[in-house]
Swiss-Prot record:
Enzyme Commission number, as recorded: 3.6.1.41
UniProt enzyme class: hydrolase
Known role: Hydrolyzes diadenosine 5',5'''-P1,P4-tetraphosphate to yield ADP.
InterPro entries for this protein: ApaH, Calcineurin-like_PHP_ApaH, Metallo-depent_PP-like
Name this protein carries in UniProt: Bis(5'-nucleosyl)-tetraphosphatase, symmetrical
Record key words, sorted: Hydrolase
Domain of life: Bacteria
Gene expressing this chain: apaH
Reactions catalysed according to its record: P(1),P(4)-bis(5'-adenosyl) tetraphosphate + H2O = 2 ADP + 2 H(+)
Family as reported in the entry's similarity comment: Belongs to the Ap4A hydrolase family.
């Protein structure tokens, strides 16, 4: 059995299929981890969603911001944006089944056998793995329950920007959701910044990548994530970023996680 992880699909299924053929992926024996953002901006969002869903237990995907945005559109609590490419999903005869499947995906997955943790964007420095798992569970429980339309409506916004155990209600769930699906930069005191999206080096002096904050409590937890195409392929600080900008005409990256030496492979995207 081999365990592979792949960066953001964002509706780009053809490059994924090329990578899986390259490694001779066998759904009966292997497992594919996806960092989230299965849909949007690319030309094959419906096909990508169906493909990953049909892999069953051979695929583990976490939710990204574009996935949650699609769910919000489906629920009627947010409008389709000009650059969205999700209309084929909204028009599909199996829309309800696909949305129900997507709504039940996790925000975090941890495999103790290989000691890797999968999430879409990042973790605030105040959280260790146990806290991250507990916070993910809080949002997942609501997302899978009767109040999920309200969560999908209330998740939009950048506040609060600082974690506190005393956070409650929708503000708490919004902060958790933002960290798992949108986070890139933090300040030294642990405040999160959702505005700047560029590569490290171009940010304001008080900002640093979430994984570079001194004293980060998740140090020692190996985390594979995506979301950050301007960062690109990055390995260091116990983290692995696999978003290499496929939807922007760059590359899609696949990594084998269960080998002693990390193996990565790429395919061009058009």
């Amino acid at each position: 059995m081999s365990i592979y992880a792949v960066g953001d699909l964002q509706g780009c299924l053809t490059p994924l299929k090329r990578l899986l053929e390259q490694v001779r992926f066998d759904p009966a024996a292997d497992q594919l981890w996806l960092v989230g953002d299965l849909v949007n901006r690319g030309p094959e969002s419906l096909e990508a969603l169906r493909f990953v869903r049909d892999l069953g237990d051979a695929a583990i995907t976490v939710l990204g911001n574009h996935d949650l945005h699609l769910l919000a559109i489906h629920q009627g609590v947010h409008k389709v944006r000009r650059k969205d490419t999700v209309q084929p999903i909204l028009d599909a005869p199996d829309r309800a089944e696909l949305m129900d499947w997507l709504r039940h995906r996790p925000l975090l997955h941890h495999d103790p056998r290989i000691q890797w943790t999968l999430l879409h964007a990042g973790l605030p420095p105040q959280w260790d793995l146990a806290m991250a798992r507990a916070c993910a569970s809080e949002v997942e429980t609501v997302l899978r329950g009767p109040d999920h339309p309200t969560l999908l409506e209330r998740m939009y916004g950048d506040e609060p920007d600082q974690w506190s155990e005393s956070l409650q209600g929708w503000a708490r769930l919004r902060f958790i959701t933002n960290c798992f699906t949108r986070l890139r930069y933090c300040t030294a005191d642990g405040s999160v910044d959702m505005a700047y999206k560029g590569a490290p080096g171009g940010q304001l002096p008080h900002l640093m990548p979430w994984f570079a904050v001194p004293g980060r409590r998740s140090v020692g937890t190996r985390i594979v994530f995506g979301h950050w195409s301007t960062l690109g392929l990055y390995q260091g600080d116990d983290v692995l970023c696999l978003d290499t900008g496929c939807v922007w005409g760059q590359r899609m990256t696949l990594a084998r996680l269960d080998s002693s030496a990390l193996e990565t492979m790429h395919t061009r995207c058009e």
